[in-house]
């Protein structure tokens, strides 16, 4: 990915993380660049009214395809291998994944149970890649990558109805 585009995505992600933190957290400590990049967390702090400290890795709305006009709110993109072939964010060190939503502001899902659930699904399918063309509807739990763009990442689309069966919190702000 070209550096200017990365910086733009990074800035947009940081603004979203600040939005989440300002509305929902107290005693915020921001991750260093290395912690964000390699440990996969944006900030640590406690949810308002809770004294326990957690690490959070904030995720924004996603389009199924970059060329799509609108963001979608049907499935969550879950990265288990990053663009350099290292561990993806679902294998990182955050405790909670706050995911921006359309139907309500945020869903927080515990990272480790999400990975355990996803890993079981991947093993059941023997890590089967999607056979669909980029413009066809996304296939839940099929493995996608962006090798065409020179990336070594692996990710799946997980329906929110399945995410909501895991331990989660819906936030109104």
What positions do the PLM features span?
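Non-catalytic C-terminal interaction segments of nucleic acid-processing enzymes
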Residues: 5, 50, 102-173
